[in-house]
Curated annotation (Swiss-Prot):
Compartments where located: Secreted
Disulphide linkage map: 24-41, 34-59, 63-71, 72-77
InterPro entries registered for this protein in UniProt: Snake_3FTx, Snake_toxin-like_sf, Toxin_cobra-type
Signal peptide segment: 1-21
Keywords recorded for this protein, A-Z: Disulfide bond, Secreted, Signal, Toxin
SUPFAM superfamilies the UniProt entry points to: Snake toxin-like
Extra remark: This toxin has not been detected in venom.
Tissue expression remark: Expressed by the venom gland.
GO MF, one annotated term: toxin activity
Protein name: Three-finger toxin A2
Family recorded in the similarity comment: Belongs to the three-finger toxin family. Short-chain subfamily.
Length: 79
């Protein structure tokens, strides 16, 4: 029983990735674990096409400024 419990604890730690890694959207539903030093998620407008804004998403150390941009620091906050 102790072996099973220890195994579950180890698997949980590995699956949770306790390294405080931030995860951001990069395109549509695609997600990326941000590298060290990039502790923000952002979504920023790069222009328009056929009357709709075109956005880029990803990890950042600093965010682009703009009225339609999103800059946040929790997992998957840049949808």
């Amino acid at each position: 029983m102790k072996t099973l419990l220890l195994t579950l604890v180890v698997v949980t730690i590995v699956c949770l990735d306790l390294g405080n890694s931030l995860v951001c959207y990069v395109s549509g539903a695609w997600q990326k674990t941000c590298p060290e030093g990039q502790n923000k998620c952002e979504k920023y407008a790069v222009g328009t096409m056929h009357g709709s804004w075109i956005y880029l998403r990803g990890c950042a150390s600093t965010c682009h400024e703009g009225p339609y941009n999103v800059c946040c620091s929790t997992d998957l906050c840049n949808k």
